[in-house]
Amino acid sequence: GLLGSIGKVLGGYLAEKLKPK
């Protein structure tokens, strides 16, 4: 659903932000 889609986007954003370079 909509919340699931938002969760995927936020999760991916946080994963990229927290990922060590």
Swiss-Prot record:
InterPro entries: Frog_Litoria
Subcellular location(s) per record: Secreted
Main location: secreted
GO-annotated biological processes: defense response; negative regulation of nitric-oxide synthase activity
Pfam families the UniProt entry points to: Antimicrobial24
Keywords: Amphibian defense peptide, Secreted
GO MF, one example: nitric-oxide synthase regulator activity
Tissue specificity comment: Expressed by the skin dorsal glands.
GO cellular component labels: extracellular region
Entry annotated with the keyword Transcription: no
Function: Has no antimicrobial activity. Strongly inhibits the formation of NO by neuronal nitric oxide synthase at micromolar concentrations.
UniProt protein name: Dahlein-5.4
Taxonomic lineage: Eukaryota, Metazoa, Chordata, Craniata, Vertebrata
